[in-house]
Structure formats: structure tokens, C-alpha cells
From Swiss-Prot:
Localization terms from the record: Cell membrane
Taxonomic classification: Bacteria, Bacillati, Bacillota, Bacilli, Lactobacillales
Entry-linked PROSITE patterns: ATPASE_ALPHA_BETA (PS00152)
Pfam families (UniProt xref): ATP-synt_ab, ATP-synt_ab_C, ATP-synt_ab_N
GO cellular component term, pick one: plasma membrane
Gene: atpA
Catalyses which reaction(s): ATP + H2O + 4 H(+)(in) = ADP + phosphate + 5 H(+)(out)
Keywords annotated in UniProt: ATP synthesis, ATP-binding, Cell membrane, CF(1), Hydrogen ion transport, Ion transport, Membrane, Nucleotide-binding, Translocase, Transport
Entry-linked SUPFAM superfamilies: C-terminal domain of alpha and beta subunits of F1 ATP synthase, N-terminal domain of alpha and beta subunits of F1 ATP synthase, P-loop containing nucleoside triphosphate hydrolases
UniProt name for this protein: ATP synthase subunit alpha
Assembly: F-type ATPases have 2 components, CF(1) - the catalytic core - and CF(0) - the membrane proton channel. CF(1) has five subunits: alpha(3), beta(3), gamma(1), delta(1), epsilon(1). CF(0) has three main subunits: a(1), b(2) and c(9-12). The alpha and beta chains form an alternating ring which encloses part of the gamma chain. CF(1) is attached to CF(0) by a central stalk formed by the gamma and epsilon chains, while a peripheral stalk is formed by the delta and b chains.
Record membrane topology: Peripheral membrane protein
GO terms, molecular function: ADP binding; ATP binding; proton-transporting ATP synthase activity, rotational mechanism
NCBIfam families (alphabetical): atpA, PRK13343.1
């Protein structure tokens, strides 16, 4: 077959037209060790701390240890397919996760990938998981309440938007229940919620998701799950990923509530990583920067200044104690970082006082400024009343011949503790809480038998809704008690008509 001369020149011209002189340069290294969720690689001399690195099988890792002869990498995924001698290349990017409205109602892993079987998440927005916390001048003081719907918290340890309030207690004392109830109570409050489950059983996470779905809270909630079966690096980065998702809303002027459940397991995962990376162990074998690990996370919760949109991110970190020991290393660290703590006591829990919040050791350091005036007025002496009741109750065990004043105090204390009990996933609007505590503080509940207190409370709420909705509306809109004696008269009128169980039984006979 002969080719004409003019065809040869046109073929050469075509080839030259397709020629590109751009050369893609990739900096690659070689894996020298892999195991337990960690790899080491040499040849990555210019890698940055926290940079995303890609292994030859498509799994990503994050540069953690930058040493003179190699780089320590935490592997973000299944490490069983990575072998010594594999190549690993730099991406030039730091670790990012997808953010935005598309994540609402979804369950994702630590990398923002969906794990709920509802298809891919369509968003083109991403944010780095590590970000410097807002500075002093970028913040505003906490002054807007975040209602949890739980009487004992809203009355004694009020939380404000932009606050960090620690929930601490032994296992199985109701820590997660308080966090979920708070999320459920944000319905119609224009608050975006993020629930970060760290190191939990997948069945437990599933139950939490179904609870949120049942009460209609999943529509405004993102669930980030790094379950116990995930490698340690996924547990370590999960809270930072959740914080990045929350910051997207916060910097767009919205209010965010984020729950870290729990940071004890994240600390354990970070300890595991650090020991495998051969970092020097410190107290309880935790690395020296374990305090910084938690402080840089929790400092990202803030109420932003008006110049930055006035958004907020409220953090509820959870810490699990052992045998009620709040003086251990991680609990004391997180207590010192946060703006207060809600301490759950296992003895109270098993005695039937639920939520089992210890009023003596629980405190809110900045939330008092955010508490509405009506609640301040009716709950002013509540903490003191509980403290004196606990003291009298332990003293009364030794003798029965108590004077009338002491007996009256004991009776009021018993009714106070009964009022502060609350059912699971049953948060109350703040106006109902205020009226109940008003009835308690004005002595209307003193005449009610202890077994009838909770029925009195629910019937009072129903009576007020039916006959005095305007009083509820006043409390809700103004944050203050209604002027005059209207509320006093309404509660007094209901109390006259309320019939205790004993009276009902006597009448039936």
C-alpha cells in the first residue's frame, strides 16, 4: 500500500496538533510499614501535616508524623488492601468533608460518605475538618437560651446558644437520652442539629437514628457515625468532621447544636494511634497533646459577632466516667475546657430519679445570662432547696421526732424531686416548665400527695392550655411572668378542683 507525499505531511500535521507539552508531576513515596490503621512511607519529603495522601488502591490517608526519614500516615478506611512497597502520592489538599443542606436527614461516616443506603449526597461544598477557632473579637457573649425541654436543666443549669456544656457520668445513666431529648426539643426552633456517634455499637446508632426519625427530628439533623467496628483514625476525625459541617451553617448566620457522643472513646482512639505512631506516652498512656486535641475541637463552638452573621454553634460533649470518678485525666481536661457540666449520678438513677442530674455538682458558667426572666424568678431558690432537702433527708434517717418546720421542708423537698422527674423523649415547652415551677415555688403542690404530683403537673398543663392559653403565650413571647395576679389565680383555681387519688377512692367508697 503506497502513501502519497501530501498525505504524509497532513498526518504529521495532525499528530503535531494533538501534541501537548504539559507534564504532570506527582510526588510519590513508598510504603515501608502498614498495620493497625497506620502506615509509614518514605519519599514524601514535602508532605504537609494533615495533608490527604492517596494509596495505590484508592484508599486515603492523612499525614500525622513528619519525621526526618519517613512520614507516619493514619489510614482513613480499610487498610487490609495496602502492602509494603505500594506507592502513595500527595494530593496537595488537606482533609475535607462535604457540607451544606444536602446532608440534613442523612447518616454519614467520618469522611462525609453516606452510610444510610439513601443514595449519594449531591453537594459541591466542602470544608476542611481542621479550622482555627474564632478569635475573641469574632465572638459575642452568650445571651440567647437554648431550651433543652428538660425541667431540671433549663431551671438549674441553663444552656445558652454558643456555649459548651459537658454531659458527664457513668455508663447507662442517661447521657445520650439527654442529648437526644435536646435535639428533639429543637423542632420548630430553627436550630440545625448534628449528632456525632463515636465508637458506639451500630445497633445503638441505628436506635438513636430511629428515635430522631420517630419524633420528626431527623429532618433538621445530620448524624455522623464512626462505629466501634471502624478503624481508630475514623473515630479520631469524626468530631472534627461534625464540627466542619456545623461551621458551614454557623458562618451562614444559623444556630447549630452539636453533640459529641462521646469524647472518651475519641481520646482512646487517639491514644491508640499515637502509641502505634511511637509518640511518647504521658499520663494514663495518653499522648502529650491530648488536651489540645479536645480544646481545639470545643473552642470551635461559639456565638459569632454580628459582623460575621451572628450565627452560633452550641456543643454538648459527652464524657463517660468510671465509678463516678470525675477527677480522672480526660474528665478533668474536658471540664476545664467547657463552660459548665451536667453531672449524672448513678445512685440517683437507680433510685428512680430520672433524669439523674446531681444538682450539687452540675453547673452552667455562662448560661445564666441566657435564662429567661420568668424561669429565673420561679427557679431562683430551687438549687438551695434541693441541697437543704438532701441534707435533711440524710439526717432524718436517724430519728423520726422532727419539728413541724423540718417536716414541711422534707415534704417540699420530696415534691420538688418528684416535679423534676421527666419521662424519656418527652421535652416540655419552656412556658409549661415555668408554670409548673411557679406552682411548686408558691406552695400549691405542697398539699398534693407525692404519688399525684406528676398527674397534677400534666392536668395543670391541660387546664392552662384549655382556659388560659393567653398566659402561656405571654411567657413564650416576653420571657417574663404575666403581670398582676392572673397566673396566681389560675393555678389556685385549678388546685381547688384537683382531686388526689386518695380523695377519689374515698368518694367512690
Amino acid at each position: 500500500m503506497s502513501i502519497k507525499t501530501e498525505e504524509i505531511s497532513s498526518l504529521i500535521k495532525k499528530q503535531l496538533a494533538n501534541y501537548q507539552d504539559k507534564v504532570s508531576v506527582e510526588e510519590t513515596g513508598t510504603v515501608t510499614y502498614v498495620g493497625d490503621g497506620v502506615a509509614r512511607a518514605d519519599g514524601l519529603d514535602n508532605a504537609m501535616a494533615g495533608e490527604l495522601l492517596e494509596f495505590s488502591n484508592g484508599v486515603y490517608g492523612m499525614a500525622q508524623n513528619l519525621e526526618s526519614n519517613d512520614v507516619g500516615i493514619v489510614i482513613l478506611g480499610d487498610y487490609t488492601g495496602i502492602r509494603e512497597g505500594d506507592t502513595v502520592k500527595r494530593t496537595g489538599r488537606i482533609m475535607e468533608v462535604p457540607v451544606g443542606d444536602a446532608l440534613l436527614g442523612r447518616v454519614v461516616d467520618s469522611l462525609g460518605r453516606p452510610i444510610d443506603g439513601l443514595g449519594e449526597i449531591k453537594t459541591d461544598k466542602t470544608r476542611p475538618i481542621e479550622r482555627k477557632a474564632p478569635g475573641v473579637m469574632e465572638r459575642k457573649s452568650v445571651s440567647v437560651p437554648l431550651q433543652t425541654g428538660i425541667k431540671v436543666i433549663d431551671a438549674l443549669v441553663p444552656i445558652g446558644r454558643g456555649q459548651r456544656e459537658l454531659i458527664i457520668g457513668d455508663r447507662k445513666t442517661g447521657k445520650t437520652a439527654i442529648a437526644l431529648d435536646t435535639i428533639i426539643n429543637q423542632k420548630n426552633q430553627d436550630v440545625i442539629c448534628i449528632y456525632v456517634a463515636i465508637g458506639q455499637k451500630e445497633s445503638t446508632v441505628r436506635a438513636s437514628v430511629e428515635t430522631l426519625r420517630k419524633y420528626g427530628a431527623l429532618d433538621y439533623t445530620i448524624v455522623v457515625s464512626a462505629s466501634a467496628s471502624n478503624p481508630a483514625p475514623m473515630l479520631y476525625i469524626a468530631p472534627y468532621a461534625g464540627a466542619a459541617m456545623g461551621e458551614e451553617f454557623m458562618f451562614n448566620g444559623k444556630d447549630v447544636l452539636i453533640v459529641y457522643d462521646d469524647l472518651s472513646k475519641q481520646a482512646d482512639a487517639y491514644r491508640e494511634l499515637s502509641l502505634i505512631l511511637r509518640r511518647p506516652p504521658g499520663r494514663e498512656a495518653y499522648p502529650g497533646d491530648i488536651f489540645y486535641t479536645h480544646s481545639r475541637l470545643l473552642e470551635r463552638a461559639a456565638r459569632l459577632s454580628d459582623d460575621l452573621g451572628g450565627g452560633s454553634m452550641t456543643a454538648l460533649p459527652i464524657i463517660q466516667t468510671q465509678a463516678g470518678d470525675v477527677s480522672a485525666y480526660i474528665p478533668t481536661n474536658v471540664i476545664s475546657i467547657t463552660d459548665g457540666q451536667i453531672f449524672l449520678d448513678s445512685d440517683e438513677f437507680y433510685a428512680g430519679q430520672r433524669p439523674a442530674i446531681d444538682a450539687g455538682t452540675s453547673v452552667s458558667r455562662v448560661g445564666g445570662d441566657a435564662q429567661i426572666k420568668a424561669m429565673k424568678k420561679v427557679a431562683g431558690t430551687l438549687r438551695l432547696d434541693i441541697a437543704s432537702y438532701n441534707e435533711l433527708a440524710s439526717f432524718a434517717q436517724f430519728g423520726s421526732d422532727l419539728d413541724a418546720a423540718t417536716q414541711a421542708k422534707l415534704a417540699r423537698g420530696q415534691r420538688t424531686m418528684e416535679v423534676l422527674k421527666q419521662g424519656l423523649h418527652d421535652p416540655l415547652p419552656v412556658e409549661e416548665q415555668v408554670v409548673t415551677l411557679f406552682a411548686l415555688s408558691r406552695g400549691f403542690i405542697d398539699k398534693v400527695e407525692i404519688e399525684d404530683v406528676q398527674r397534677y403537673e400534666s392536668e395543670l398543663a391541660a387546664y392552662m392550655h384549655a382556659n388560659h392559653q393567653d398566659l402561656y403565650d405571654t411567657i413564650k413571647k416576653t420571657g417574663k411572668l404575666p403581670e398582676g395576679d392572673d397566673l396566681q389565680n389560675a393555678v389556685a383555681k385549678f388546685s381547688e378542683t384537683f382531686q388526689g387519688t386518695k380523695k377519689q377512692v374515698a368518694e367512690e367508697k
